[in-house]
């Protein structure tokens, strides 16, 4: 396990530089005790993708690939898996619900093995490179990419800001409340 402190860097820029090498970013904006870390996941390896319930048992498959490593470190990630679980995965956990779920082109569940990360601790104002296998090649690539970031120009985005008509939005809220009361849904996410 390698943990190397580095200078603070804009994690989003890594994604801009190479989205294949840096595919996932969890960024905290409420820098308090419970939301103090931003994590840029690096060097994706094997993946497990569930597209249909009948393909395989996703959670059992994931568990068979996970090795528990015990590290007494004060960081939220020291190597492991980045996992996306859709609401539809409930169809494998509670099979009676599977027939009621909508089909989609988006995977039901998706896991990617991630050996390295760049982690910013906003509370301590420190940034670290973490590599679970002490892989100098990956660590040096991250450091090289950091140097390359200095040459990325700042660009503004042209366009207009628009938002949905307020009446249409509030009608959607009312409809959602009706669905919840009727028991048709248990959660609704609305955004504007």
Go through each PLM region and give its residues.
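Signature of the chorismate-utilizing enzyme
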Residues: 1-192
């Amino acid at each position: 396990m390698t943990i190397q402190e580095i200078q603070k860097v804009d994690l989003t820029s890594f994604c801009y530089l190479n989205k294949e090498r840096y595919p996932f970013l969890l960024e905290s904006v409420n820098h308090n005790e419970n939301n103090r870390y931003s994590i840029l996941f690096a060097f994706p390896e094997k993946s497990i993708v569930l597209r249909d319930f009948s393909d395989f048992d996703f959670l059992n498959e994931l568990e068979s690939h996970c090795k528990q490593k015990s590290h007494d470190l004060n960081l939220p990630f020291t190597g492991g898996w980045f996992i996306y679980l859709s609401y539809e995965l409930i169809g494998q956990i509670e099979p009676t619900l599977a027939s009621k779920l909508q089909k989609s082109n988006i995977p039901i569940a998706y896991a990617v093995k991630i050996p390295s990360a760049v982690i910013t601790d906003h509370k301590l104002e420190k940034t670290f490179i973490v590599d679970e296998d002490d892989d100098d090649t990956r660590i040096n690539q991250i450091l090289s990419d950091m140097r390359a970031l200095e040459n990325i120009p700042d660009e503004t985005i042209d366009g207009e800001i628009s938002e949905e008509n307020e009446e249409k939005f509030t009608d959607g809220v009312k409809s959602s409340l009706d669905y919840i009361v009727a028991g048709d849904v248990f959660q609704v996410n609305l955004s504007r």
